[in-house]
Amino acid sequence: MKRFISIIAIVFFTMVPSGYSLKKTDYRDARLKNVCKDLKGDALLYFIFIDSRTTTPWTEFDIQSTIDSVRMAINWLHTQARKNNISLNIISDFFIGEEFTTITKNLPSGTVTESITQPNMKKGTVLINTWADGIARIAGNSLPIKEKEGLPEIKNPRNKERLVAYLRDENNVESVALFFMVNNYYKTDISVQMNTMNTEDVEFAIVSYKYPSEIAHNLLHLYGAADMYRTIFRDNTKKIRFLESEFPDEIMQDPYGKNIWTLEISSYTKYLIGWENEIDYRYESYLTD
């Protein structure tokens, strides 16, 4: 159950979605971008349970407890929004087959960590996106398609972009946060967010743990929030230490196993998710890594 937080040497200073260069990562590049522009209004958290060769099989108990954690995470997010006078209504839904059957699809390179970093970050990103499209196609094939008079025949979603578009229209929401849930509760791996700093494909997250804090943490990622601890997305030790001392109870610190009700959303994160229009000048240099 120990959380994997060590940095992979090949990562250098790049973000997964940002074009694979050695330039500094600027977390503002994920602000107000793509499908999950800002965490306001009506939003859908849609999650799909995935079994793979290297993860623990999902049981009915695991699935039910994850659904409970999602509800708690959403409750916490609604509480934070009310405290900040933000209009926010998150609903949740999930894909599951009959008798709690999941989608079985092996990760490209075994674990989440290996899949995103092997053989390198650029190739790993391509493979992860292809993997996610394959899952979206399986889920999309089971969705009911309503015929609309006078309109061309609508086909079932065949990739994650079309799946998100379908879910957005069907649920009449402004944004869709797409989660692929893998069961690493008793294993050592990471969660990861994809496509948050570009508009070439829709955002999604692969989430390894079912803690409410982990779920809220990764949902905020899709709306532009940045890690404050050492991950494959942040490596500057000096900045990590400052953010830890400045925001010790921030949800974007390592969320593993933490009681979500002891955590908060700092002004730093509020800026990145669109809850505030400006950020204190003292924190501007910490928006890069």
Give the positions of each predicted feature.
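Short pre-active-site segment immediately N-terminal to the catalytic Zn-binding motif
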Residues: 198-216
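Solvent-exposed loop/turn segments at secondary-structure junctions
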Residues: 52-55, 183-188, 209-213, 257-259
